[in-house]
UniProtKB/Swiss-Prot annotation:
Ranges for domain Protein kinase: 43-329
Keywords for the protein's UniProt record, in alphabetical order: ATP-binding, Kinase, Nucleotide-binding, Phosphoprotein, Serine/threonine-protein kinase, Transferase
Organism encoding this protein: Arabidopsis thaliana (Mouse-ear cress)
Catalysed reactions listed for this entry: L-seryl-[protein] + ATP = O-phospho-L-seryl-[protein] + ADP + H(+); L-threonyl-[protein] + ATP = O-phospho-L-threonyl-[protein] + ADP + H(+)
In-chain residues carrying the UniProt-annotated modification Phosphotyrosine: Y203
Residues modified as Phosphothreonine: T201, T206
One Pfam family of this chain: Pkinase
Gene giving rise to this polypeptide: MPK5
Post-translational changes noted in the entry: Autophosphorylated on threonine and tyrosine residues.
Family note: Belongs to the protein kinase superfamily. CMGC Ser/Thr protein kinase family. MAP kinase subfamily.
Residues the record lists as binding ATP: I49, G50, R51, G52, A53, Y54, G55, F56, V57, K72
PROSITE patterns the record matches: MAPK, PROTEIN_KINASE_ATP, PROTEIN_KINASE_DOM, PROTEIN_KINASE_ST
Description of how activity is regulated: Activated by threonine and tyrosine phosphorylation. Activated by the MAP kinase kinase MKK2. Activated by the MAP kinase kinase MKK6 in vitro.
Active site: D169
Record's protein name: Mitogen-activated protein kinase 5
Amino acid sequence: MAKEIESATDLGDTNIKGVLVHGGRYFQYNVYGNLFEVSNKYVPPIRPIGRGAYGFVCAAVDSETHEEIAIKKIGKAFDNKVDAKRTLREIKLLRHLEHENVVVIKDIIRPPKKEDFVDVYIVFELMDTDLHQIIRSNQSLNDDHCQYFLYQILRGLKYIHSANVLHRDLKPSNLLLNSNCDLKITDFGLARTTSETEYMTEYVVTRWYRAPELLLNSSEYTSAIDVWSVGCIFAEIMTREPLFPGKDYVHQLKLITELIGSPDGASLEFLRSANARKYVKELPKFPRQNFSARFPSMNSTAIDLLEKMLVFDPVKRITVEEALCYPYLSALHDLNDEPVCSNHFSFHFEDPSSTEEEIKELVWLESVKFNPLPSI
């Protein structure tokens, strides 16, 4: 089965040379006006490969292992508590999670002096591209590609959920790929424990992949939110178009109900809020669309699985474990090669009263685990 894909990056292959600073212990680069200052073991040239709301990413070479790696710079990481917590959360989670379908964190680069710890540089394994870029490209994708992508997403999610963690921000750009189609889940900055019930005010996950219970501000959400996101991604791989590209919350719910039909009273019992139930009941009513007509390129086993993922009531939505056992993935499913995490992840470090300086200290301590401080 030929699964190779071509690399696709937005920023080209521009190589940028560096200059040695701090007595030769660090390389400094100017990347499109962004200062990059990293340990001298990450040798030039480096090349920019991506930018986003939470950082700028460059590829470089680790001179000790001769591997090409990705370095994400989070600028002014401790200027506000929300971003600082996000950075700490992602570092701690990726150190805890060890799975073939979860991106590997390799290093955290510290500045020479603790008082200069303003920007955070996180080193990851390098992947060639992401699913968003592949979907938007002219790269041909067949059903084998789709099966393999979906299987790896679910395999990684099974492990993540078994660690008592919800990703909460699954979308094509957070699914990294290499040229032989190996897939890794990234960006755990919004992750939460499965047992939390408090609604997250900083929740900023991309609206298009957001489950109905989140759109309706349900305070008690479960791992089913990630399954909904996977369903949206599954359909997007097949059609090369976002499934529910809502312009706002109201439009998002309208697009959802136009496809899967307006929920009946029994499907709203998961909503504790009487106001939320009343709101949904007063929305325009839509019948359920025929999925075979809506997705003519999908075979019957793919449609069967998609329908089970896109269920309004999270209680009735298929679980990751059940999805892995579905006929659509039977050629890939192997229970003995779908590991779970041996230990639950604890978010105990997230003290709401923590200051930016206290969070900075915790991130500094994380960096020490990768690079112990020199003994005096």
